[in-house]
Amino acid sequence: MAKLHDYYKDEVVKKLMTQFNYNSVMQVPRVEKITLNMGVGEAIADKKLLDNAAADLAAISGQKPLITKARKSVAGFKIRQGYPIGCKVTLRGERMWEFFERLITIAVPRIRDFRGLSAKSFDGRGNYSMGVREQIIFPEIDYDKVDRVRGLDITITTTAKSDEEGRALLAAFDFPFRK
């Protein structure tokens, strides 16, 4: 079991119970899933780019990504409905906790010119989204084998009812928010 999951059960639940005066342990917000999304717009011209992006995402997450397709045609971008234009992975359970731990302890500190993550990236329902400009911050990606530096979106979905609860949950994990 991931250390961060044990830490959540032992420490974070107690801390949030007292902070928000919950009556039941089930009211305490928890991390439900983490979604990684990589948009590869250049895949229209070269299908191999999408395969490389999917391989990178599989290495980062430890799970085979789902190829996302365009929902509608956009003439300005030369995209037709149904064209493969990206890939995504939804992590839950054990893999989610392991990825979350790697994200906080290893990947985020390796971001170039890192001064902390914005605390304003909550969506109003306690979910946090962040963008990463380079996939090479993850230790699973071999820098020499990267054909192109790509970014990805990371969304942390929680059961929190408000941004305040979501922020308190992530702060309890020592999430590196900007001061």
Swiss-Prot record:
<dbReference type="GO" id="GO:0005840">
    <property type="term" value="C:ribosome"/>
</dbReference>
<dbReference type="InterPro" id="IPR022803">
    <property type="entry name" value="Ribosomal_uL5_dom_sf"/>
</dbReference>
<keyword id="KW-0699">rRNA-binding</keyword>
<dbReference type="InterPro" id="IPR020930">
    <property type="entry name" value="Ribosomal_uL5_bac-type"/>
</dbReference>
<dbReference type="GO" id="GO:0003735">
    <property type="term" value="F:structural constituent of ribosome"/>
</dbReference>
<dbReference type="InterPro" id="IPR002132">
    <property type="entry name" value="Ribosomal_uL5"/>
</dbReference>
<dbReference type="InterPro" id="IPR031310">
    <property type="entry name" value="Ribosomal_uL5_N"/>
</dbReference>
<comment type="function">
    <text>This is one of the proteins that bind and probably mediate the attachment of the 5S RNA into the large ribosomal subunit, where it forms part of the central protuberance. In the 70S ribosome it contacts protein S13 of the 30S subunit (bridge B1b), connecting the 2 subunits; this bridge is implicated in subunit movement. Contacts the P site tRNA; the 5S rRNA and some of its associated proteins might help stabilize positioning of ribosome-bound tRNAs.</text>
</comment>
<dbReference type="Pfam" id="PF00281">
    <property type="entry name" value="Ribosomal_L5"/>
</dbReference>
<protein>
    <recommendedName>
        <fullName>Large ribosomal subunit protein uL5</fullName>
    </recommendedName>
</protein>
<dbReference type="Pfam" id="PF00673">
    <property type="entry name" value="Ribosomal_L5_C"/>
</dbReference>
<dbReference type="GO" id="GO:1990904">
    <property type="term" value="C:ribonucleoprotein complex"/>
</dbReference>
<keyword id="KW-0820">tRNA-binding</keyword>
<keyword id="KW-0694">RNA-binding</keyword>
<dbReference type="InterPro" id="IPR031309">
    <property type="entry name" value="Ribosomal_uL5_C"/>
</dbReference>
<dbReference type="GO" id="GO:0000049">
    <property type="term" value="F:tRNA binding"/>
</dbReference>
<dbReference type="GO" id="GO:0019843">
    <property type="term" value="F:rRNA binding"/>
</dbReference>
<comment type="subunit">
    <text>Part of the 50S ribosomal subunit; part of the 5S rRNA/L5/L18/L25 subcomplex. Contacts the 5S rRNA and the P site tRNA. Forms a bridge to the 30S subunit in the 70S ribosome.</text>
</comment>
<dbReference type="GO" id="GO:0006412">
    <property type="term" value="P:translation"/>
</dbReference>
<keyword id="KW-0687">Ribonucleoprotein</keyword>
<comment type="similarity">
    <text>Belongs to the universal ribosomal protein uL5 family.</text>
</comment>
<keyword id="KW-0689">Ribosomal protein</keyword>
<dbReference type="InterPro" id="IPR020929">
    <property type="entry name" value="Ribosomal_uL5_CS"/>
</dbReference>
